[in-house]
Amino acid sequence: MSKQIQAIRGMNDCLPEQSGLWQWAEKAIREVVASYGYQEVRTPIVESTDLFKRSIGEVTDIVEKEMYTFADRNDDSLTLRPEGTASVVRAGNEHGLLYNQQQRLWYLGPMFRHERPQKGRYRQFHQFGVEVFGLAGPDIDAEVIALSARLWKKFGISEQVTLELNSLGSNEARETYRKALVEFLLARKEHLDEDSLRRLESNPLRVLDSKNPQVQAAITDAPSLIDYLDAESKEHFHALCERLDALGIQYRVNPRLVRGLDYYNRTVFEWVTDSLGAQGTVCAGGRYDGLVEQLGGKSTQGVGFAIGMERLVLMLQASGAEEFVASPVDVYVTAMGDEVELYALQIAESLRDVMPTLRVQTHFGGGNFKKQMKRADKSAARVALVLGETEQQEEQVSIKFLREDKPQSRIARSELESTLVELFSL
């Protein structure tokens, strides 16, 4: 026997018993973004490596350690996308969607990062995200945060997540803060790990993002970015907080929140949870007013967020959301005898013609009554249509209830559609 091929480490299969919850979550997401008037955009999985070096930043863990990068036959450097924002901006620039326009977009799809697999984190993972372009005010920041809050409400997990908020200010304000932070960190250099020392030279704000407890202890008294904000950024942040207060969205200002990508300015936020272990971020985003121009477009403001779908699904499983997932089958059609199989096939197809939302599965492979009922029960269908020679000869159908304590009944085939419409409230 040949050696069985396994999935690549960190690449996860979504099996039928899991896909129902994914589909339920994706449907809920589509309903919420539609209620805000956002439109879907789909971008390629493979992009030029330069796109991510210029957007995410060359001195980031993603670009330095985690990207799946390869040379194609033309020796061009290509990368499996590690996140969605850069691709959406690239598409917007390329197709003239952004300059002097307002766009509210969303996406959902697979991303790739070569990081250590752990609970809810895989090397191929899925992100849902929204990106808004052409609006500079705090009102749109509030809207995208409100949209994310509405998703938690839709999923029934609002009590499990906390909104953390910060402002990174303008580039000029960050540069002033950067100097103060570097001075502070240099005085505590012996307490920094190798990663933090490297970041100290290239991107000192990222030291604040360190997960090392020793580093965290050393930066407890670090200067706060909020104290260095320019007047316009302070006003923007204050106005955002006012809007969140008016909407009843609770938040906590976290002066250490800097985000792991280089393109953010002003508003940054994360929804965190303690139900997923130490790394508890389930949603993150912020404002990136310079990114469009950085990637070759004309100056256009942007703001958005992304949700890790694997982490979201873990939370939904823990909260019991699977009870809302419909069974994959409503009606299981059986055929007692080879001569009856054609009759069963005709009935199943006629039901799909008349009731396209009804999920009908037909039994194939023969077997006695007991075997077919066992398959019907395993399908999780609510009812089985029992068809034998008598039913075929008399143009009838027997209905057996699989989940309710009701007697089996026989009706005319002509009454089947109306009976099922009433039974399933179609």
Curated annotation (Swiss-Prot):
Catalytic activity: tRNA(His) + L-histidine + ATP = L-histidyl-tRNA(His) + AMP + diphosphate + H(+)
GO molecular function: ATP binding; histidine-tRNA ligase activity
Keyword entries, A-Z: Aminoacyl-tRNA synthetase, ATP-binding, Cytoplasm, Ligase, Nucleotide-binding, Protein biosynthesis
EC number(s) on file: 6.1.1.21
Family matches, as Gene3D superfamilies: Anticodon-binding domain, Bira Bifunctional Protein, Domain 2
Catalytic class of the enzyme: ligase
GO annotation, biological process: histidyl-tRNA aminoacylation
Localisation: Cytoplasm
Gene Ontology annotations for the cellular component aspect, listed alphabetically: cytoplasm
Any Pfam family hit: HGTP_anticodon
Main location: cytoplasm
Subunit structure: Homodimer.
Family: Belongs to the class-II aminoacyl-tRNA synthetase family.
Protein name (Swiss-Prot/TrEMBL): Histidine--tRNA ligase
Protein source organism: Pseudoalteromonas atlantica (strain T6c / ATCC BAA-1087)
